[in-house]
Amino acid sequence: MEYLMKSEWIRLKAKDGHELDAFSVKADDPIGNIVVIQEIFGITDHIQAVCHKFASNGYDVIAPAIYDRFERNITLDYTQIEEGVGYKMKLSDDYAMSDIDAAHTYLGSKTAVIGYCYGGMLTHIAAS
């Protein structure tokens, strides 16, 4: 699918020094920022489409690749549920929060956090 907004992969650095990739889409005239937290399947085409949708509505958006803690560029098919759950179980909530915080810090003030599936649970933790 082609999008009007330019996207790119960037590198974030968490407070513990860990570097992770993140999918980034910039709005033309941003009104705020959003961190989109992935599903158990990684930064899928669906998550990238969600980022583009938010950017087309005026938000700078970053989706941190939180599985980079143990393997880079993990993107699973939606049929690979068991593998996705396995990756989720390997990642501690503390490390996930550190990576989400790195995305929030990169975007700055006026930043919201939203997640889908596993990301929804992490969004709840990030808000508490």
Predicted regions and their residues:
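N-terminal cap/leader regions of alpha/beta-hydrolase-fold enzymes
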Residues: M1-S128
